[in-house]
Each structure stands twice: as C-alpha cells, then as structure tokens.
Amino acid sequence: MELDGNVAPQTVASFIYLARDDYWNDGGCHRLTTSGIYVLQCGDPTGTGTVTPPYGFGIENPPTDGNYPRGTLAMARSDDPNSNGGQFFLVYKDTQLPTEGGGYSIFGQVTEGMDIVDAVAQQGVDGGAGDGAPKQPISILSVDVAQKT
C-alpha cells in the first residue's frame, strides 16, 4: 500500500503510529460487503469490528462525488465524523458511498495484493448475506512501514 500524507496527514500519521506499535499484528479483516458497496474492512485487532484505538480524529480528503475507485485505501468510521481510528477499508470494485455526514478519509492506494482481496471477495460473506464476516478468513500478520525511495 502507498500512503499519501499530503492529502491526509493526520490519517497517515495515525496509521504509521499504529503500525509501528504493532496494533494490527495478528488481527483480521472482519467485514466484507458484496452488494452495492464493495469493500473489505480491516483494522480491529480482535477481528470483531468493535475495537478502536483510544482516540479518534476527523475526516480528511473525502471525495466530493462519493466515488471510491478500486484499490482505494480509506478509513472506516461510525456515524460520528470524528471517529476515524484504526479501522480501514480496501475497495475491491469501484464503489459509490454517501457523502452525507462527510464521507470517508482516503489516505492511500493498494499497490500490490489486490488479487488476494479479490479472492476473499469472490468467496463472499459467511452465511451468504451481502454484508458480514468474510467466508474466507484473512489475517494481518504484521504491518511494516517504509519510506518510499
């Protein structure tokens, strides 16, 4: 993944902080959506979708048209626009998300590994619904941060 601190400095700083703190190590991706919205949501170290870091921050760099192209890396949040924290999502198919409430912070792009996200998405949601835990479990073993050269 490539992060863009120029457009979302607070989001990228938080992501780097959490990565260096091993926040996501051995966590999972707990949510897959397969109808209308096409994202794989990750970032809760327990894999339940209920845990966030002990802080939150506001929305940065949301698209005004609500368009999130394939490969987008964006922050997940609750209805509270200041609830960005540790959960994020990977867009695996061009997706239109509501702009009401401020949208979602785009802070990077997936540069490698979309084939893995596609494989998880192809398996669908556990139980067959359009939104829920991925049928194919996926884990984040570790996250390393490196300066782009």
Where are these regions (language model features)?
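Cross-family detector of peptidyl-prolyl cis-trans isomerase
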Residues: 1-149
